[in-house]
């Protein structure tokens, strides 16, 4: 939720943000009107209540002849106070509803436009070149007996898979590598719940335009999370945090679930776009004044992972119209996928400023002793999709895959992933 004071004092900023996103500006006008009605209703209620209290004192002091009249006036005022209180509550609810329809205010410099209007920040690394026809990740995975899409579909349906043998080991190694980097950077690891309450899912902004991508258990009224960001944001809901020693940082490891609604026909081959996957998510609670610096810190950690895995990648500043409702700015890190001849998103990091914290009631106490909403940020440090880039980038002509040096300690020192036929022949 955006700051109501910003809406009140600078509605032009909110309108400009909506225009950058290509979103409705009418909702801003509606929220401004609702805020005005709320303040008028509260003023009326407080005035009538003060009048009621004053009459109550007069009744206590009145002589016998005047008491019936004053009591009648008090009763009338009581009814008016009750009605005014109801109007104030209704106005408060209307404002809350209007405010929840306004996404976060984008940060200065975020490019305008939609999915294809991102700004390139940098390209890093040399794209893999081969003296043979490269295989895609699924063909490599089948040669290694590491990825089984057929049985995944048999057991669970389309966009499900098994990671088998070295495939399972590779994913666990990747996650442990990311976790080691998180610990090195001082993040506290958490294994998070994957089922959350509606108020937590709504508080993080995932029940807006993309609600159809979320799995819901109707009988229990719980949501399956598509990222541990949701649980990590809810972890300190309705709390006052102590940031005197600096930001509070977590690394959440969880299984994630996404419906991939609207993705029909996209990435149907392999494990680029699946319904279930593993993810290690960084999450920071910081003083809002430090949020942009923290965003750069998270991005630097992601880039270091890309470099240590030997992946060519680019960093883009996502356009406003392609941001989720909670994000004020989002950087995507996209790795080069040789067989697609394209960069594909492997990870992203978002600065949600105080948007989620306002919804979830997460505050911190400043130097002046007053409390105010914290800023929250998130970024992925490892996930299943990275296997795609690792297999394709480091493949060899015989179907084997060279293991990046940084990953070898997490695979028992293994230097090469060998085809299953070669292993069987030994």
Curated annotation (Swiss-Prot):
Sorted UniProt keywords: Aminoacyl-tRNA synthetase, ATP-binding, Cytoplasm, Ligase, Nucleotide-binding, Protein biosynthesis
EC assignment: 6.1.1.11
GO MF, one annotated term: ATP binding
PROSITE patterns: AA_TRNA_LIGASE_II (PS50862)
GO biological process: selenocysteine biosynthetic process; seryl-tRNA aminoacylation
Location (main, coarse): cytoplasm
Gene3D superfamilies recorded: Bira Bifunctional Protein, Domain 2, Serine-tRNA synthetase, tRNA binding domain
Pathway: Aminoacyl-tRNA biosynthesis; selenocysteinyl-tRNA(Sec) biosynthesis; L-seryl-tRNA(Sec) from L-serine and tRNA(Sec): step 1/1
Binding site for ATP: 258-260, 274, 345-348
Enzyme class: ligase
A cellular component term, taken from the record's GO annotations: cytoplasm
Entry's localization field: Cytoplasm
Catalytic reaction equation(s): tRNA(Ser) + L-serine + ATP = L-seryl-tRNA(Ser) + AMP + diphosphate + H(+); tRNA(Sec) + L-serine + ATP = L-seryl-tRNA(Sec) + AMP + diphosphate + H(+)
Superkingdom to which the source organism belongs: Bacteria
InterPro entries: aa-tRNA-synt_IIb, aa-tRNA-synth_II, aa-tRNA-synth_II/BPL/LPL, Ser-tRNA-ligase_type_1, Ser-tRNA-synth_1_N, SerRS_1_N_sf, SerRS_core, tRNA-bd_arm
Keyword Protein biosynthesis attributed: yes
Disulfide bonds: none
Pfam families with a match to the protein in the record: Seryl_tRNA_N (PF02403), tRNA-synt_2b (PF00587)
Binding site for L-serine: 227-229, 281, 380
Summary of subunit composition and partner proteins: Homodimer. The tRNA molecule binds across the dimer.
Family that this chain belongs to: Belongs to the class-II aminoacyl-tRNA synthetase family. Type-1 seryl-tRNA synthetase subfamily.
Domain description: Consists of two distinct domains, a catalytic core and a N-terminal extension that is involved in tRNA binding.
Main function: Catalyzes the attachment of serine to tRNA(Ser). Is also able to aminoacylate tRNA(Sec) with serine, to form the misacylated tRNA L-seryl-tRNA(Sec), which will be further converted into selenocysteinyl-tRNA(Sec).
HAMAP family (UniProt xref): Ser_tRNA_synth_type1
Designated name of the protein: Serine--tRNA ligase
Organism of provenance: Clavibacter sepedonicus (Clavibacter michiganensis subsp. sepedonicus)
The organism's taxonomic lineage, starting at the top: Bacteria, Bacillati, Actinomycetota, Actinomycetes, Micrococcales
């Amino acid at each position: 939720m955006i700051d109501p004071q910003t809406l009140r004092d600078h509605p032009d900023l909110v309108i400009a943000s909506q225009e950058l996103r290509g979103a409705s500006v009418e909702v801003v006008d509606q929220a401004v009107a609702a805020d005005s009605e709320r303040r008028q209703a509260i003023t009326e209620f407080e005035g009538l209540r003060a009048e009621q209290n004053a009459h109550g004192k007069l009744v206590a002091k009145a002589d016998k002849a005047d008491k019936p009249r004053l009591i009648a006036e008090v009763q009338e005022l009581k009814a008016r106070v009750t009605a005014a209180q109801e109007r104030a509550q209704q106005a408060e609810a209307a404002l809350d509803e209007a405010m929840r329809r306004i996404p976060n205010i984008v940060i200065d410099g975020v490019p305008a436009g939609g999915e294809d209007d991102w700004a390139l920040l940098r390209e890093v690394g040399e794209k893999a070149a081969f003296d043979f026809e490269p295989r895609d990740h699924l063909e490599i995975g089948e040669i290694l007996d590491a990825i089984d899409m057929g049985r995944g579909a048999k057991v669970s349906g389309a966009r499900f898979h098994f990671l088998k043998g070295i495939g399972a080991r590779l994913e666990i190694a990747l996650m442990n590598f990311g976790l080691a980097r998180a610990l090195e950077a001082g993040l506290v690891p958490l294994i998070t719940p994957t089922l959350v309450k509606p108020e937590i899912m709504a508080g993080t902004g995932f029940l807006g335009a993309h609600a159809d991508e979320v799995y819901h258990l109707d009988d229990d009224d719980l949501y399956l999370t598509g990222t541990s960001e949701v649980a990590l944001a809810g972890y300190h809901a309705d709390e006052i945090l102590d940031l005197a020693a600096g930001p509070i940082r977590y690394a959440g490891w969880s299984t994630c679930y996404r419906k991939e609604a609207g993705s029909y026909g996209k990435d149907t081959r392999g494990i680029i776009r699946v319904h279930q996957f593993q993810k290690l998510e960084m999450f920071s609670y910081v003083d809002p004044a430090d949020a942009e610096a923290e965003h750069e810190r998270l991005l630097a950690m992601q880039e270091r992972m890309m470099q240590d895995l030997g992946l060519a990648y680019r960093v883009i500043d996502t356009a406003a119209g392609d941001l989720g409702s909670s994000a004020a700015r989002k950087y995507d890190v996209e790795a080069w996928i040789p067989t697609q001849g394209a960069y594909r998103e492997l990870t992203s990091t978002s600065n949600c400023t105080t948007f989620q914290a306002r919804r979830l009631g997460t505050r911190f106490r400043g130097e002046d002793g007053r409390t105010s909403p914290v800023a929250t940020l998130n970024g992925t440090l490892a996930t299943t999709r990275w296997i795609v880039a690792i297999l394709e980038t480091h493949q060899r002509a015989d179907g084997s895959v060279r293991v990046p040096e940084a990953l070898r300690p997490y695979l028992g020192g293994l230097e090469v992933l060998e085809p299953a036929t070669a292993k069987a022949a030994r």
